[in-house]
Design a protein with these regions (language model features):
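Hydrophobic faces of well-ordered beta-strands that scaffold small-molecule active sites
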Residues: 2-5, 233-235
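Flexible, acidic loop-helix segments that line cofactor/substrate-binding pockets
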Residues: 45-60
Length: 264
């Protein structure tokens, strides 16, 4: 590691002491300094760029959108299912589709002017979403948000709102008939799986590295009922970090790893 997170004097004191007592060689230290300076030399501030109060926000937004798109990874695409035909009617499943994750937590979080949810992006792209599912999930997301907004006493390091960066998944086992109805009335199904991610910790196993019971039910039953109707299913992963996929990757026809795509 050539660069540590700045902010405290203690690491600086440790490095100086390490060089003085011989635990760290000056050659090793100079090598790290060289790499950091090399990185700085490549920055735009070192190439004549001047700060201004009127950045080209439209160009920056277009660049952010292009980078997000180019960074996505198509993990599976049986019989070239994706891209979806323009104007298709989509049954959009998954709470994260209606409250999508733009970035991570902690130091990976940045201020965002807005967040374009996956549902909104699809509609702007000319696709038609199931109004039934849109209404159902919108109410569910509002209810989940209320759990945080109406309980400020739960805001601290250990309680609900600090640890809750992703909307919980809706339990479709209590409304299984909706899946069959959507399989009849929609052209395809998209399922969105979401996971938060931040620094200084690994994933828990149950319900984090592995799918939750609600997510398993959703993928299995949406896939089986849409396939029975001769229609295809894709899973979009709005995640950052590792997840177990081997147990369910054969269910959908396509899997797109969208990562955390930012505000656009």
């Amino acid at each position: 590691t050539d660069l540590m997170m700045p902010g405290e004097q203690s690491p600086v004191d440790e490095i100086i002491a390490g060089v003085k007592n011989g635990r760290i060689s000056e050659t090793t230290l100079n090598k790290s300094v060289k790499y950091v300076l090399k990185l700085i030399s490549k920055s735009i501030s070192n190439k004549g760029w001047e700060y201004n109060e009127a950045p080209d926000l439209a160009a920056n937004a277009a660049l952010a959108r292009r980078i997000a798109t180019e960074g996505m990874v198509l993990l599976k695409n049986d019989r070239s299912f994706l891209p979806i035909s323009q104007g298709a009617k989509i049954a959009l499943f998954g709470a994260t589709a209606y409250k999508s994750i733009a970035g991570g937590t902690g130091s990976s979080n940045v201020n965002k002017a807005h967040i374009t949810d996956i549902s909104t992006g699809l509609e702007k792209g000319g696709y038609t979403l199931s109004n039934r599912l849109k209404g159902l999930y919108t109410k569910f997301v509002e209810f989940q948000n209320d759990l945080l907004d109406k309980h400020p006493e739960s805001t601290d390091w250990e309680k609900l709102s600090y640890n809750r960066t992703v909307i919980a998944e809706m339990d479709l086992s209590k409304a299984e008939s909706i899946i069959g109805q959507e399989a009849k009335n929609s052209d395809i199904a998209l399922i969105v799986i979401g996971r938060g991610s931040g620094e200084e910790s690994d994933r828990r196993l149950e319900g984090d590295f592995y799918l939750t019971p609600e997510e398993k039910f959703m993928i299995e039953n949406v896939s089986s009922q849409f396939h029975a109707a001769g229609k295809k299913v894709a899973v979009v992963m709005n995640v950052c970090g590792v997840m177990e996929m081997n147990s369910w990757k054969d269910e959908p026809d396509a899997i797109l790893l969208a990562w955390f795509p930012g505000q656009e």
